[in-house]
Amino acid sequence: MRSKAELFVMGLTPVDERKMPFGGCLWYANEHCDAYEKRIEEACINQNVPFLPTFKEMNSDSRSINWLSNDGIHLNASGHLYIYQRLRSWEALQKWRFN
């Protein structure tokens, strides 16, 4: 059975490990974000689902720490702007929008 909905998947964003543990009990590590994003990408490839990797590019950008909210996990307005700009130029999304 084929789905009638289009599906696109975006990767993960880095965290500020200095802010851990989040909520006093949860530890998030960039090493784990990287590994998990690779698994998500593999699953998308296996299912022929467009995947936009984000973790490595964001994590390697020295500005990325400024794209996180004070909790060190969630994106702030600047982080969401970065994602928006990536999505606007993503070829898979452009093909879908104009077909």
Predicted regions and their residues:
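Alpha/beta-hydrolase-fold catalytic nucleophile elbow
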Residues: M10-G11
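Short acidic/His/Gly/Ser-rich catalytic and metal-binding motifs that mark active-site loops
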Residues: D16-M20, N59-I65
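Substrate-gating cap/lid alpha-helix
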Residues: E17-T54
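Short low-complexity, flexible loop/linker segments enriched in glycine and/or proline
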Residues: G23-G24, N66-S69
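Histidine-centered active-site loop/cap adjacent to the catalytic His
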Residues: K38, Q47-P50, S69-N99
